[in-house]
From Swiss-Prot:
This is Tyrosine-protein phosphatase non-receptor type 2. Belongs to the protein-tyrosine phosphatase family. Non-receptor class 1 subfamily. One of its GO terms (molecular function) is STAT family protein binding. Keywords: Cell membrane, Cytoplasm, Endoplasmic reticulum, Hydrolase, Membrane, Nucleus, Phosphoprotein, Protein phosphatase, S-nitrosylation. It catalyses: O-phospho-L-tyrosyl-[protein] + H2O = L-tyrosyl-[protein] + phosphate. The gene is PTPN2. It comes from Homo sapiens (Human). The keyword Endoplasmic reticulum applies. The active site is at residue 216. GO terms for biological process: B cell differentiation; erythrocyte differentiation; glucose homeostasis; insulin receptor recycling; insulin receptor signaling pathway; negative regulation of cell population proliferation; negative regulation of chemotaxis; negative regulation of epidermal growth factor receptor signaling pathway.
């Protein structure tokens, strides 16, 4: 028998009401002050000008000259869940990121984006990818890679975070979802839930640890989807009746703009409905998720579906998948789930390889531009100093000559 959420999902699908529901949530969301993010000294710590933490829920760095970081503490008391939702670190904020992880006693970092997506840099490389440790002298931390477990669509790193001043070390789990497209949704609820339950099984989300740090690029779309699904499943485990819209509105009191598109909202419903099967005691469901996710295949890279760009919000586009909405969407939730999980493997792999090549090329181009800019700066500095140094050299020759002549003159007079 369909649950209340399943009936609500079917109704929203049948009436094509995802966009209106999403707009309702946006319009009913409260806006709170975020003045600190706009201080002149903090502007270069924000990845996007219009995604800022609220003053009342922002994470404050302790014992720092400037306590600002673009991160929000989302505290859902009834679920006994706390998350730190943050942007993808910038090159100048990686040190603050690790300081926050240390001070908040975080056990895991959940990363839901790639470094480069659609030829745009979405996040700095803030963790080591080889045996060489990374030093963050500004805040006094080093990070070392202990192990790496690479799956087809996610990777788990085990990192050692060391406080250089005290010598104390902590082990941090880094869960990296590598195929979730920006403004999009994962390939299937099965793959997403398989990943979510891997994070859960590590104990990193439990209340006896500091809050898990969850980020994508802006820290609101994919991060909001992850947090919403996990929170709703926890509430269902406790036997509570849940209203997904109300839960999301409550979470939006802590960080602006959580869930960026109607597609992400629809996917959240699908993942919650599918995840509820495990909560209700279906012991085989997690095994089925793992099989459907094909996590043991060779890693592949994400491909984003074609989008219809409809409007802008928080500096980001709201896109709906280009699909012909027909009566087939009303054929039942199970078939929708199954259809979402299927794809053409060969075609997908080719697209993913092309996307990876583009990303690699974009990264190389950016590095080349940085080198050219540095060379240009050096050239301009040299052009500025060259005439000054030439004049100084000329004056030095005159002074030395005058000194020598003066010395010889006095020597002759002395004789």
């Amino acid at each position: 028998m369909p649950t209340t959420i399943e009936r609500e999902f079917e109704e929203l699908d049948t009436q094509r009401r995802w966009q209106p529901l999403y707009l309702e949530i946006r319009n009913e969301s409260h806006d709170y002050p975020h003045r600190v993010a706009k201080f002149p000294e903090n502007r270069n710590r924000n990845r996007y000008r219009d995604v800022s933490p609220y003053d009342h829920s922002r994470v404050k760095l302790q014992n720092a000259e400037n306590d600002y970081i673009n991160a929000s503490l989302v505290d859902i008391e009834e679920a006994q869940r706390s998350y730190i939702l943050t942007q993808g670190p910038l090159p100048n904020t990686c040190c603050h990121f690790w300081l926050m992880v240390w001070q908040q006693k975080t056990k895991a970092v959940v990363m839901l984006n790639r470094i480069v997506e659609k030829e745009s840099v979405k996040c700095a490389q803030y963790w080591p990818t080889d045996d060489q440790e990374m030093l963050f002298k500004e805040t006094g931390f080093s990070v070392k890679l202990l192990s790496e477990d690479v799956k087809s669509y996610y990777t788990v790193h085990l990192l050692q975070l060391e406080n250089i001043n005290s010598g104390e070390t902590r082990t941090i789990s880094h869960f990296h979802y590598t195929t979730w497209p920006d403004f999009g949704v994962p390939e299937s609820p099965a793959s997403f839930l398989n990943f979510l339950f891997k994070v859960r099984e590590s104990g990193s989300l439990n209340p006896d640890h500091g809050p898990a740090v969850i980020h994508c690029s802006a820290g609101i779309g994919r991060s909001g989807t992850f947090s919403l699904v996990d929170t709703c499943l926890v509430l269902m485990e406790k036997g509570d009746d849940i209203n997904i819209k109300q839960v999301l509105l409550n979470m939006r009191k802590y960080r602006m703009g959580l869930i960026q598109t109607p597609d992400q909202l629809r996917f959240s419903y699908m993942a919650i409905i599918e995840g509820a099967k495990c909560i209700k005691g279906d012991s085989s469901i997690q095994k089925r998720w793992k099989e459907l996710s094909k996590e043991d295949l060779s890693p592949a890279f994400d491909h984003s579906p074609n989008k219809i760009m409809t409007e802008k919000y928080n500096g980001n586009r709201i896109g709906l998948e280009e699909e012909k909405l027909t009566g087939d969407r009303c054929t039942g939730l199970s078939s929708k789930m199954q259809d979402t999980m299927e794809e053409n493997s060969e075609s997908a792999l080719r697209k993913r390889i092309r996307e990876d090549r583009k990303a690699t090329t974009a990264q190389k181009v950016q590095q080349m531009k940085q080198r050219l800019n540095e060379n240009e700066r050096k050239r301009k500095r040299w052009l500025y100093w060259q005439p000054i140094l030439t004049k100084m050299g000329f004056m030095s020759v005159i002074l030395v000559g005058a000194f020598v002549g003066w010395t010889l003159f006095f020597q002759q007079n002395a004789l």
